[in-house]
């Protein structure tokens, strides 16, 4: 549609020992996926609301010419802005008079996430080592606003759902005020950050008589 947009970038370099891909994705059509190593994009499943995404990343596989050391790196940075808005109008039939309801909610979630994974392996002679490193950082903010009200007469003549609720909560003098039987509003603001890191290293040394010494070191932080 007129207000929907999408832009993608995928770049690939490779030689006998290195394969590097760079990618970017910017859109407001709820697409949050990253491509595969061949540049194939898989669709996301986010049917509700509207999410604007900006994403950049890289994938690297490399080795030395003797294949003694191999290294694999994945890194991404993602900014998302998700907006979910709901409006409803209903009428309940009752013996004492019909009850008219109007409600509206707006939820906005803004997130930033950066991640890095590195897997390195070394194999030469009697020595071997594998190192796995993972880093994750996220920063999120959520704003939510919900309004609802009930009336003893049909408020449709005062306008749309939004216009009726605006008059219900913000107008000092209005014919609509005499029709209100109940109203409530909820506003919330949440913000949180997180960081986690993990490291797992395994190494061995093969002794001349065939036995093998092994060591494993791992740690996490969050």
Task: List where the protein language model places each region.
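Primarily recognizes Gram-negative and organellar outer-membrane beta-barrels
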Residues: 1-5, 17-222
């Amino acid at each position: 549609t007129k207000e929907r947009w999408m832009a993608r970038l995928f770049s690939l370099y490779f030689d006998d020992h290195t394969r590097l891909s760079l990618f970017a994705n910017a859109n407001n059509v709820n697409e949050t996926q990253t491509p595969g190593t061949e540049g194939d994009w898989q669709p996301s499943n986010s049917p509700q609301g509207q999410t604007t995404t900006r994403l950049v990343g890289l994938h690297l596989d490399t080795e030395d010419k003797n294949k003694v050391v191999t290294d694999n790196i994945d890194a991404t940075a993602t900014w998302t802005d998700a907006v979910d808005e709901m409006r409803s109008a209903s009428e309940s039939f009752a013996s004492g008079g019909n009850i008219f309801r109007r409600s509206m909610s707006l939820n906005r979630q803004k997130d930033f996430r950066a991640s890095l994974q590195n897997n390195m392996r070394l194999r030469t002679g009697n020595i071997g080592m594998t190192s796995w490193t993972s880093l994750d950082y996220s920063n999120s903010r959520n704003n939510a606003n919900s309004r609802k009200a009930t009336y003893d007469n049909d408020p449709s003549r005062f306008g749309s759902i939004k216009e009726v609720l605006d008059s219900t909560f913000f107008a000092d003098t209005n014919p609509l005020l005499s029709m209100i039987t109940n109203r409530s509003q909820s506003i919330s603001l949440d913000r949180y950050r997180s960081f986690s890191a993990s490291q797992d290293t395994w190494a061995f040394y093969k002794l001349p008589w065939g036995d093998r010494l092994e060591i494993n070191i791992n740690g996490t932080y969050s």
